[in-house]
């Protein structure tokens, strides 16, 4: 896919977990602007979604999901003609077994029906592949694809109970199972892409592949996600393929954000991103990246800043730029990391280093701007009561306490 489209080397999620990142992806708003930062918050009705904008422009719209944080309880279904959450229906554990083949089959069935319509519409489909999420239990042959000789007892389930003291060999196996999940999901996406080719849709469809967060494997002492805002948890893949506008093999090194995806899709489709409704006075706004994808590298600057002002990652807040990241652990302790991949965020300046003070000033200014904007009438995410089935699914994943 990347060889036929554009690959963003440094795409950054606005949070190290599913709920706020997906709301950002589908609204073009930073979590500080949409407010869905906790398990008991849902998307405000006043905030437009990408699906609503596209349906208003005559698109058929459908979503297919398999994770509890994607349930319609949170407001995701707005703007979708069909929002299929059958694979995360009441009574399902939500993270046991495989779901990608059924998701692809459901989407393919919907697309086939749309193609048979008397007057087919352009379509927008949102597909949430869940199998890469833990538990890491890919089906054969993917369970042994990357580590066929392993004879230990670790099986990739209940990874939240694994300790950093586990053997290096066992950890290698966990990573191999994760890689197996990725390869399995890759195969299932290939099935979908082949259908698009067979139907003559492949070369006139905007295809965006990304993720809501990464995974930690004790690079900084934790496993899973939610715990830190180091790059292993927030740097994600982002590939965009659309032959009418994007040269094959394009690689963009600049840092971009998940909040830029929705306006970029609209830009490639010839629709004004202002329809997403973000107030112009908001401290951080979405960016339509379609000019860069079309090869116009003089079309202004790509924002060099991703802020994490909502206490993600164990009470830490921070800001990430193209070359550095500041993490504030508390009012008296800060760290500045070089984010070059080969350094693994292990070289740091602490305390009162000039570099820390300069970036800290940027973070403090952003926090002040956000707080002022919120006081002046920014939309507040409404609270919600978790249904019993949703609560059970989140408990099973270890996201909330029993």
Where are these regions (language model features)?
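Catalytic domains that recognize anionic headgroups
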Residues: 1-402
């Amino acid at each position: 896919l990347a060889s036929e489209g554009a690959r963003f080397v440094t795409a950054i999620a606005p949070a190290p977990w599913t709920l706020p990142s997906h709301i950002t992806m589908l609204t073009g708003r930073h979590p500080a602007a949409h407010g869905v930062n906790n398990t008991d918050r849902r998307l405000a009705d006043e905030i437009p979604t990408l699906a609503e904008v596209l349906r208003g422009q005559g698109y058929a719209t459908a979503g297919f999901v398999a994770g509890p944080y994607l349930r319609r309880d949170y407001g995701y279904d707005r703007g979708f003609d069909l929002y299929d959450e059958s694979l995360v229906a009441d009574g399902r554990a939500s993270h046991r077994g495989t779901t990608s083949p059924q998701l692809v089959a459901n989407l393919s069935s919907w697309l086939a029906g749309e193609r048979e319509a008397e007057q087919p519409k352009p379509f927008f489909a949102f597909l949430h592949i869940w199998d890469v999420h833990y538990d890491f239990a890919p089906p054969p042959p993917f369970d042994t694809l990357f580590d066929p000789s392993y004879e230990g007892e670790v099986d990739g389930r209940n990874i939240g109970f694994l300790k950093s003291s586990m053997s290096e060999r066992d950890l290698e196996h966990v990573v191999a199972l994760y890689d197996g999940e990725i390869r399995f999901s890759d195969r299932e996406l290939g099935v979908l892409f082949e259908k698009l080719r067979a139907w003559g849709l492949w070369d006139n469809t905007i295809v965006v592949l990304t993720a809501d967060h990464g995974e930690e494997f004790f690079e900084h002492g934790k496993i899973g996600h939610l715990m830190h805002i180091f790059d292993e948890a927030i740097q994600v893949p982002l590939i965009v393929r659309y032959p009418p506008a994007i040269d094959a093999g394009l690689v963009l090194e600049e840092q971009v954000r998940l909040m830029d995806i929705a306006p970029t899709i609209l830009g490639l489709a010839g629709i004004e991103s202002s329809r997403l409704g973000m107030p112009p006075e908001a401290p951080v706004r979405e960016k339509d990246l379609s000019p860069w994808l079309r090869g116009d590298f003089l079309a202004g600057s790509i924002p060099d800043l991703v802020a994490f002002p909502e206490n993600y990652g164990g009470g830490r807040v921070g800001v990430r730029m193209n070359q550095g990241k500041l993490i504030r652990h508390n009012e008296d302790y800060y760290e500045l990391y070089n984010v070059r991949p080969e350094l693994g965020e292990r070289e740091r300046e602490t305390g009162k280093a000039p570099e820390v003070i300069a970036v800290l000033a940027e973070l403090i200014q952003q926090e002040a701007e956000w707080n002022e904007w919120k006081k002046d009438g920014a939309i507040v995410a409404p609270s919600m009561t978790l249904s019993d089935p949703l609560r059970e699914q989140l408990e099973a994943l270890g996201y909330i306490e029993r």
